[in-house]
A protein has these predicted regions:
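Conserved nucleotide-binding and Mg2+-coordinating catalytic segments in signaling enzymes
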Residues: 5-25, 44-58, 66
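Catalytic-core segments of nucleotide cyclases and related cyclic-nucleotide turnover enzymes
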Residues: 54, 58, 102-106, 132-165
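Active-site-flanking beta-strand signature of metal-NTP-handling nucleotidyl enzymes
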Residues: 40-45, 82
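Short regulatory alpha-helical coupling segments
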Residues: 6-7, 20-38, 69-77
Length: 166
């Protein structure tokens, strides 16, 4: 019974991913177990969720959220951990460097593009992703690292908006 309650308290009901609490606990554990190693923290955001919900309904918005969770988990693979930490926000943590962060970001874009071209959905599923490289250790505060990755996401969103306007 305790295992079931623990699972439910750390899982996101919509996506089956870790929720914020579960992700933070797992990230702290990974940090503790990998002192001195480099890790990439990715912070991702589903683009245009409000417009999807407003135009096509919350069932479609939920579908887009689930699809984003699947795409991110697929790109990260078994070497890392992913979670949905808020409404349309996702995080991942995996061993690697900046090149790995860029590779994951590009893979997610390719998977979203593939889904969008094959889908009969009247909207696009797209994720903006920022990442931050850390060196694990006892002095690392995971919430601070997530803030840094969130700032990188914000910069990525600004760049993407500018490139779309051109």
């Amino acid at each position: 019974k305790n295992e079931v309650l623990n699972f439910l308290s750390e899982s996101d009901a919509l996506t089956g991913s870790l929720n914020r609490r579960g992700f933070m606990e797992k990230a702290v554990q990974i940090n503790r177990e990998n002192a001195g190693k480099e890790m990439v923290i990715l912070f991702a955001d589903l683009d245009h969720l409000k417009e999807i919900n407003d135009s096509f309904g919350h069932i479609e918005g939920d579908f887009a959220i689930r699809r984003c969770a699947e795409v991110l988990k697929s790109a990260v693979g078994d070497s890392g951990v992913t979670g949905r930490i808020g409404g349309d926000e996702f995080c991942a943590m995996l061993p690697g460097n900046a090149g790995d962060g860029q590779r994951i970001r590009e893979q997610v874009r390719r998977e979203c593009d593939g889904f969008n071209s094959d889908s009969d959905k009247p909207y696009y599923v797209e994720l903006s992703i920022g990442y931050h490289v850390i060196r694990c250790g006892s002095d690392l505060v995971i919430s601070d690292v997530l803030k840094d990755a969130d700032e990188a996401l914000y910069e990525e969103k600004k760049k993407r908006r500018k490139s779309v306007k051109k």
